[in-house]
Amino acid sequence: MYMSLNNYKIETERICKQKGWTNAAIDTVWLLLTEEIGELASAIRQHERTYKKTGLKKQRGTDVMMEMGDVFSYLFQLSSMLNIDLDKMWVEHGKKLKFKKYNLR
């Protein structure tokens, strides 16, 4: 079953309105997104045991999922602020991927 990406955007709009976050500037939300991407990277490194932080206040087990949720939340918020139709974006992105080649190890 396919869930519309726009539904997640609408839900994020509702939460932002409820929390009073609708007046945030696009550049502020962008900076918050990049901060969360860094936190996701750190959580992935912890999960993959690339490095180990000491003195943590909480267990790192669910951090990847939670940080990824934060990243998606800010992406949905930006898509709302920029009036992006996420379902259309995903279809167009899929078309682009058909021809894109990566040399990944």
PLM segments and residue spans:
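Flexible "arm" and connector segments at domain edges
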Residues: 1-68, 72-105
